[in-house]
Regions:
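First exposed extracellular module after export/assembly in secreted or surface-exposed proteins
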Residues: 43-208
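Bacterial signal peptide processing site
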Residues: 30-33
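Predominantly extracytoplasmic/ectodomain segments of secreted and cell-surface proteins
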Residues: 35-37, 75
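C-terminal motif of bacterial Sec signal peptides marking the signal peptidase cleavage site
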Residues: 25-28
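Bacterial N-terminal signal peptides that target proteins for export
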Residues: 2-18
Length: 208
């Protein structure tokens, strides 16, 4: 009798463990599937070389986001960061070391405005429920409908979402979904990139 009970408990625990592993694998697959590979994105920033930047501000306060882009000026990469704090100020971070400038910041997602690099790049920040996120700054629906790569998203009044000036769709920065202005069930959410950050003074990586 004792052996029978033991066997049942063992089988129950085994099945429970296998179910847990299966759920983890499914979640992992979902996370991987959500990463956009349509446009190349590779961003690497050494926070320890630039303490106190708005890049880290965005990753250490829930509901704080920043628009990130880059341009090479006089042989050095300049990183541009504009927080959603309502001040409408863009911080310029000059990468002054050879090690930093060895990296290539040409590919930061879909944006490709040669006149104003600050309209390109991605948006990153810390959500309330899903940790750090990085979204492409271009409207995915206008990219598909009209072609080209110049449909930059801008902050809305509450600065927890962004709006496309062309189609007027509004996207949540918490989830990347459309909250207003949707046209059909086939509307696309924001394109998402993988983000890695271990805390203040550590490297920031965004890419696909």
């Amino acid at each position: 009798m004792k052996n029978s009970i033991y066997n049942k408990v063992y089988i129950y625990n085994k099945v429970k463990s296998m179910a847990g592993i299966a759920m983890l694998l499914l979640c992992s697959c979902d996370a991987e599937n959500s990463i956009s590979t349509q446009y190349p994105c590779q961003f690497y920033f050494k926070s320890q070389y630039h303490p106190g930047t708005s890049l880290e501000t965005a990753l250490n306060g829930t509901g704080v986001y920043t628009m990130v882009s880059a341009k090479k000026v006089n042989g050095a990469w300049n990183i541009y960061s504009t927080l959603n704090d309502g001040k409408n100020q863009t911080e310029t971070i000059i990468l002054s070391t050879a090690k930093e400038n060895y990296a290539n910041y040409t590919y930061l997602g879909a944006g490709n405005d040669p006149k104003d690099a600050r309209k390109n790049g991605f948006i990153m920040g810390l959500t309330n429920f899903s940790g750090p996120v990085a979204w492409d700054r271009q409207c995915p629906n206008c990219l598909e409908q009209y072609g080209g790569t110049n449909y930059p998203l801008e902050w809305t009044g509450n600065r927890q979402s962004v709006i496309c000036d062309k189609c007027k769709r509004i996207y949540s920065l918490e989830y990347g979904t459309i909250t207003s202005g949707g046209k059909s069930k086939s509307d696309k959410p924001l394109m998402q990139y993988r983000i890695t950050y271990g805390g203040k003074g550590t490297d920031i990586y965004v890419g696909n």
